[in-house]
Regions:
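Selected transmembrane alpha-helices and immediately adjacent juxtamembrane segments
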Residues: 5-18, 23-35, 39, 121-186
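Hydrophobic alpha-helical transmembrane segments of multi-pass small-molecule transporters/permeases
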Residues: 6-9, 26, 30, 43, ...
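Small-residue-rich segments of transmembrane alpha-helices in multi-pass membrane proteins
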Residues: 6-7, 33-41, 98-100, 196-200
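Transmembrane helix-loop junctions in multi-pass membrane proteins
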Residues: 13-24, 47-54, 105-115, 178-187, ...
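Juxtamembrane transmembrane-helix boundary signature
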Residues: 38-60
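Alpha-helical transmembrane segments of multi-pass small-molecule/ion transporters
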Residues: 41-42, 89-147, 172, 176, ...
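Alpha-helical membrane segments and immediately flanking helix-loop junctions
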Residues: 56-111, 193-209, 215-239
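Transmembrane helical segments that form the transport core of multi-pass membrane transport proteins
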Residues: 154, 158-224
Length: 240
């Protein structure tokens, strides 16, 4: 691991233009596509969740997680508390899709079709539910942990959500830079490197391909359903 980190740091120093350009692109994409839809919902949903009496129904947590998408869903699931480990894991899998506002807003604009954005959203949510149903059979069950459950003020909710958004931005920038440094040695692997590393950059790349809308929608659904390292690490950080 130390060798890999040293090589990564050296690559950043040798290719500063690539590093800075990738980081700038990630920040622009985050500010224009992720932050506007995710931050306001995260503030409101966190305040709402903490004003409900636990234990909360799993269906309610699932619906709220779907509304925010990933990683807001992971934060809500962790904040809910009182969930057995198996149920918690299944909810995390089912809520691993990106925000509906990303699909119906940003993605629909990139594909020039709200219908395609809706189809992609439905596909990702359905596949997440199926994966959660099958994955839950092999998960061990641990007793629920009772969390400290008190109401959040607006100031606390905004502060907590802002810290979360900083984490999301940081992960997005880091993995976008990693992808940018890997692509020049393996130019033919761009279509694999981006989905593995950073999902929003991969979705943007797919939308720019000279393909029919149906193919783009199918590819975007697969890429968004997988999530990539950036989204996985965000979820792991917010719901350990």
């Amino acid at each position: 691991m130390a060798v890999m980190l040293a090589l990564l740091a050296l690559s950043m120093l040798i290719f500063p233009a690539v590093t800075m350009d990738a980081a700038a692109q990630a920040c622009r994409l985050f500010a224009g596509s992720v932050l506007p839809g995710l931050f306001p919902y995260m503030v409101v949903s966190s305040m709402l969740l903490r004003r409900m009496k636990p234990p909360l129904p799993a269906l309610l947590i699932l619906l709220m997680g779907w509304g925010g998408g990933s990683p807001a869903g992971a934060k809500l699931i962790h904040a809910a508390g009182g969930l057995p480990s198996r149920q918690k894991s299944r909810l995390l899998i089912a809520c691993s899709a990106l925000s509906p506002m990303f699909f119906l807003g940003t993605l629909a604009k990139w594909l020039a079709s709200p219908v395609c954005g809706g189809i992609a959203l439905f596909s990702v949510l359905t596949s997440g539910c199926l994966a959660a149903a099958f994955a839950g059979k092999g998960l061990s069950t641990l007793p629920a942990k009772q969390e400290n459950h008190r109401s959040l003020s607006l100031q606390e909710a905004v502060e907590s959500s802002a810290r979360t958004m900083l984490l999301v931005c940081g992960m997005t920038v880091f993995f976008r830079v990693c992808a940018a440094l890997l692509i020049p040695p393996f130019p033919q692997g761009r279509g694999v490197i981006l989905p593995v590393m950073e999902v929003t950059a991969a979705v943007e790349y797919v939308c720019q391909l000279p393909l029919p809308p149906g193919w783009k929608t199918a590819l975007v659904s697969g890429v968004a359903g997988f999530g990539g390292c950036s989204l996985m690490m965000q979820n792991r950080s917010l719901c350990p």
